[in-house]
Regions:
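Boundary at the C-terminal end of the N-terminal hydrophobic targeting segment
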Residues: 20-23
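N-terminal secretory signal peptides that target proteins for export/translocation
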Residues: 1-5
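Bacterial N-terminal signal peptides
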Residues: 8-18
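Extended repeat-based scaffolds of very large eukaryotic assembly and lipid-transport proteins
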Residues: 25-330
Length: 330
C-alpha cells in the first residue's frame, strides 16, 4: 500500500510538472493528450470510466488571462472530475459526478461570441441540451447522445460536439453519427414485425411457471439481435409481473454493459427498433431517406403512420408532429 501511494504521488508530480512546463496548453488538453482520465460513450451516455491518478486539485493561469481549476476525486467509490476554465471571452465547466451525473456548460464573457450551451445528463432521465441566452433558449431532449445527434444534427455539430471532443479528440462524434445513420438506412428490410413478435413471446415466457422455460426465454433474449435492447427499454413495466420485471431489468443491464465505447454497428443495431429515431429520419431533406423511414415506421408501429413523405414541407411537419404525439402516447 505504501509503495502504491508513493508511486501514485510520483506519477502526480510528473504530471503536474508537465503542466507547469507547458503552461500555455490548457490543463484539459494536457489531460486528454496524456490520457490521465478515461472517458467513454457507453449506451449513448457520456461516462468518466476511471483515472490514472488519485485525488488531485490543480490551479493554473497564464499571461493571457486564462484561469483554470482541475479537481479529480473519488465520489462514493466512483471517479469524479470538475474542470473550470475562464478567459476574456468565455467560461467553460465540465462536472462529472457519481451516478452517471454530467453537466457541461459554456457561456460567453464580455464581448465573446460563444452561444450559451448547457448539456445535462442525469440518471434514468433524458439528456438535455440547452442553447441560447436565457430570454431566447432552445432546449432539446433525447434518450441518448446518439438520439440527440440524429434528431438535431446541426445544433449538435455546431455547439455540443466541439466541446465534448475536448475530452476525447479521437471521438469524431459527427462522423460516427453519420455512420450510424448510414447503417440504419442500409440495414432495413428485415421482417421487423416477426422479430418483435418473437421478442414479445419470449418476454411472456419470462413469467412462465416452469423455471426451465423462464431460463430459455432469458437466454434467447440475451442472444437476440442487439436492437432488442431498444425494444426492452420501451416496455411498459407496469404490465409485467415481478419475475418478468426482474429478468428484463437484468437483461437490459447486461446488454448495456457489454462494451465500454459504442461502435456505429452497435448503435445502429440498438436504434433500429426505436420509432423516435425513424421519426427524426422522416424529417430529412432526402426523399429516399424519408421514404425508407416511413416504411420502417409502418413496420414498427404496425399501422399507417399518417405521414406522406412526398407532401409539401409544411404538411409533412404537421403530420410528423401528429405522429410524434401518437408515439409518445404508446
Amino acid at each position: 500500500m505504501w509503495l502504491h501511494r508513493m508511486a501514485t504521488a510520483g506519477l502526480l508530480a510528473v504530471w503536474l510538472a508537465a503542466f507547469c512546463a507547458q503552461a500555455q496548453e490548457p490543463l484539459l488538453n494536457q489531460a486528454a493528450q496524456h490520457k490521465w482520465m478515461q472517458f467513454s460513450i457507453a449506451s449513448g451516455r457520456v461516462t468518466l470510466e476511471g483515472t490514472r491518478v488519485g485525488n488531485i486539485q490543480s490551479n493554473n493561469s497564464n499571461s493571457s488571462g486564462r484561469r483554470e481549476q482541475l479537481n479529480v476525486r473519488n465520489d462514493n467509490g466512483e471517479p469524479a472530475m470538475t474542470y473550470e476554465r475562464t478567459n476574456a471571452d468565455e467560461s467553460l465547466l465540465f462536472d462529472f459526478a457519481s451516478g452517471d451525473r454530467v453537466r457541461i456548460r459554456r457561456t460567453p464573457k464580455g464581448a465573446g461570441s460563444v452561444v450559451p450551451m448547457e448539456f445535462v445528463q442525469l440518471p434514468n432521465e433524458k439528456l438535455v441540451l440547452t442553447l441560447g441566452p436565457a430570454d431566447h433558449q432552445q432546449a432539446y431532449q433525447a434518450a441518448s447522445l446518439w438520439h440527440l445527434l440524429i434528431a438535431q444534427p446541426q445544433p449538435c455539430k455546431q455547439h455540443l460536439v466541439p466541446v465534448l471532443e475536448m475530452l476525447r479528440p479521437d471521438w469524431k462524434l459527427a462522423e460516427t453519427a453519420a455512420k450510424v445513420e448510414q447503417r440504419l438506412l442500409q440495414g432495413v428490410g428485415g421482417d421487423v414485425a416477426a422479430q418483435r413478435s418473437r421478442w414479445a413471446a419470449w418476454i411472456e415466457q419470462l413469467g412462465n411457471d416452469r423455471f426451465a422455460k423462464r431460463e430459455a426465454a432469458d437466454r434467447a433474449l440475451r442472444a437476440a439481435d442487439p436492437s432488442v435492447l431498444s425494444y426492452l427499454r420501451q416496455l411498459e413495466f407496469g404490465r409485467l409481473d415481478a419475475e418478468q420485471q426482474f429478468r428484463v431489468r437484468r437483461i437490459i443491464d447486461a446488454l448495456s454493459g457489454q462494451s465500454s465505447d459504442d461502435s456505429p454497428e452497435q448503435v445502429a443495431a440498438t436504434l433500429s427498433g426505436d420509432p423516435t429515431v425513424w421519426l427524426a429520419l422522416l424529417g430529412r431533406p432526402e426523399p429516399s431517406t424519408r421514404q425508407t423511414a416511413a416504411r420502417q415506421l409502418v413496420a414498427l408501429l404496425g399501422e399507417p403512420i399518417g405521414v406522406d413523405p412526398a407532401a409539401d414541407p409544411a404538411t409533412q411537419q404537421t403530420q410528423r408532429e401528429q405522429l410524434r404525439a401518437r408515439i409518445e402516447e404508446k
